[in-house]
Structures are given as C-alpha cells and as structure tokens.
Amino acid sequence: MVLPTLAIVGRPNVGKSTIFNRILGERVSIVEDTPGVTRDRIYGKSEWLGKEFAVIDTGGIDLGDEPFLAQIKDQAEIAIDEADVILFLADIESGVTDADERVAQILYRAKKPVVLAVNKVDNPERRQDIYDFYSLGFGEPYPLSGTHGIGLGDVLDAVLAAFPSEDKSVEDDSIKFSLIGRPNVGKSSLVNAILGENRVIVSPIEGTTRDAIDTKFEAVDETFTMIDTAGIRKRGKVYENTEKYAVMRALRAIDRSDVVLFVINAEEGIREQDKKVAGYAHEAGRGIIIVVNKWDTVEKDNHTMKDFENLIRQEFQYLDYAPIIFVSAKTKQRLQSLPAMIVAVSENQTRRIQSSVLNDVLMDAITVTPTPTVNGKRLRIYYMTQVAVKPPTFVVFVNDPDLLHFSYERFLINQLRQAFDFSGTPIHIIARKRK
C-alpha cells in the first residue's frame, strides 16, 4: 500500500524547504532566501510517532503572469492532487498577504484536510500575531519556527491525526535509477516521456532542474524509482551557491541509484564535461546505460549510428561495458526498450557466480594466456571467489599482489564478461596474498 502523503504548500519564501528538511531530518531541498528557488516538487519519506509517511515539497504557488511561476503553480497543484493531507505554510513576518489568500482559494478547491502553520515564529512575543491567520479559514493556525524546530511536533501530531486510518507501510524493493548528464541534454524531457506525466519542470533554460526528484512507476512487471538529477555543471560555471549544492545532490542521487542513465545530447556530440559526468557514476560502481538523446534531430545515413557508437567507445573507453541506446524524448523513439534494459543491468549488478564455476573460467583463462612474469618472478593465481555485488567484486588469491598488472587484471575482467552476462556493470578485482 502507498504511504500516506503530506504536501507542503504555500506562497514563495515562507520556508517550505526548511520545514521539509526539518521533517526529513536531512537537507533535501535547496534552501535559499530567494522567492521561487524551490523550482520543483521533491519527494521524501519520514516517520513520526512510529508512522511512516511521504512528504512532498513544492515550488511556491504564485498566480503571477510569469510563465515560470505558472509552471511552479502547476507542480504544486499536482502535489496537492497526490496528497492525503496538505500543510499550508504562511509566515508571521509578512502577515496575511493577498498571495496567502489566493493560495487558500486553491486549497479550498482541493477538498483535502489542511493543517495551517505559521512559520518564523522565532520568539514568544510573535505568537500574539498568529490569530490574524484565522481569517484564512482553516481553523487554528500552529506557530512554527523552521529555524529552531520549535512547534514542529505539534504540527506533525495534527498531520498524523488527519491522515487516513490505514497504516500499512511498504518495503521499497524497487529498482532505483537516475539520469545524469550535462545541463540541457534533455533529462527532464526524458523523464516526462517515460512517465507520461509532467512531473518535472521542462524549460530551455540551462540548469532549470535543480533538485533530484524521486518518482515511482511500473513497467515490464517491475517497480522503478526514478531519480531525475540536476545537470552537473562545469566547475567554472558553478558560481551560484544553489547550483553548487545541486551538483552535490546529483552525486548523492548517483550514490542512491542501482543503475545510472548517462544522457548525451546527439545534437552537440560529446563534450569534455560529459566524460567527467560519466566518471562520477563509473567510480561509484553503478550500473550504467549510455542514452543518446535527441537522435531525431540528427541527419543520418546507414553509418551514422555505428559511427556515433564508435566515437562513444573511443571517448569513453572505461565504459566499454555500458550498453548504448539511441532515443528521442520528443518522438519517444526506442524509449519502450529502456525499462527492460534497466532491469537487465540491475540483475547483472547483483549476479553471483559459484566459486567452482568461477575457477573453471579462471583456469581456462590462464591456460589461454599464461600469467605474466615481472623481474623474473611469475604471477601465480591460486583461486578466485566473489565477495560482493553492486558492483560484482572478486578476490583473486595470488603469490604476490604487486605482480597483478592492470593489463592482466583487465584480461581477467574481459574473460568474466565473456563467460557471464555482466553487461552494464563494472567489475572489480582485488588481489590478495594467499596465506
């Protein structure tokens, strides 16, 4: 059963992201004292008094004429539709504003339980001003200080009381994957095309998607959690504090992923920054699928795809294990193949090989290509065993670990790939001296 869901809603700059972070106990939203900085909704999971629930942080609702603010409003309304309870946040410093009243009108139409909280009540003297917020029509307003965490317990008590009575949490065994790549390679458009719902703000402005958004969906009889990350920016261009934090958070999203979709813009080709972006996922040992997006915009002949694939293999030699797929978020070309590919790579990440079978392959490999000699001393490999998954990790017991040159280690990895299906996942080999 789906967890009960709380959506935090309010006009810009009332402290929604601060409260969201307080509830989750970790910094998930990007907090900056600028209206509109929380550009998209974010999902998280929390617990209060033994009850688990999901939390949605939204961009500020603003009914101004700016197209970007209209998109934020749309995202907030989607979050409202998905929520069981709405936490309507205002702030004591501004008092009841016209924007608060317009937000209230949206919430009246939602016909969902609403808990009204007034943020920035950082000292007792300010509590007397809270009664002005009764005029919003949602009953007793709860005083709250996001900065100090004061009053949050009372707010969460009210939220839990308003949740539906069912309390059946579900263990998350979904396949988690993220989309990484330079800004403006089309990650958000890919997310929308895969989901068929505008869950992520799509804009031609580079760097629009600042946070990682967790979204569950089902396909090919599997449950997936998709984490859409902010584009990783060139170091010289990352000058805003918010963008710097978004890069950090994108890397954390990679750490949370089982599989990473590394997205390249077919129009722009391969850039130096692409290599650094892919390196993050490779070094983290994640499963990787290379997704060439905007393929519909490229003029093609019979050799175009093969030539582009060869270029990728040349520029990303360390990703020789990663499958490549050419797609178009706009036309949805080949997107139907992605879920099955993700499942296959996830299975390969967790594949375990029996030691007896493993050592048969090892002995055959040594017979074909004998171990090298270094300074007159030959490497002797006695046996191999698998010690971990995600990524598959093998220990080879040898007479001297220093004799295992990286070229022979690479040979052994290639032999494992030929014998077993490890497509999409790196393989680690550790040499240990036999005692």
Swiss-Prot record:
Belongs to the TRAFAC class TrmE-Era-EngA-EngB-Septin-like GTPase superfamily. EngA (Der) GTPase family. One of its GO terms (biological process) is ribosome biogenesis. GTPase that plays an essential role in the late steps of ribosome biogenesis. CDD domains: EngA1, EngA2. Associates with the 50S ribosomal subunit. Gene3D superfamilies: 3.30.300.20, P-loop containing nucleotide triphosphate hydrolases (3.40.50.300). The keyword Repeat applies. GTP 1 binds at residues 10-17, 57-61, 119-122. This is GTPase Der. The lineage of its organism: Bacteria, Bacillati, Bacillota, Bacilli, Lactobacillales. The keyword Nucleotide-binding applies. It comes from Lacticaseibacillus paracasei (strain ATCC 334 / BCRC 17002 / CCUG 31169 / CIP 107868 / KCTC 3260 / NRRL B-441) (Lactobacillus paracasei). GTP 2 binds at residues 181-188, 228-232, 293-296.
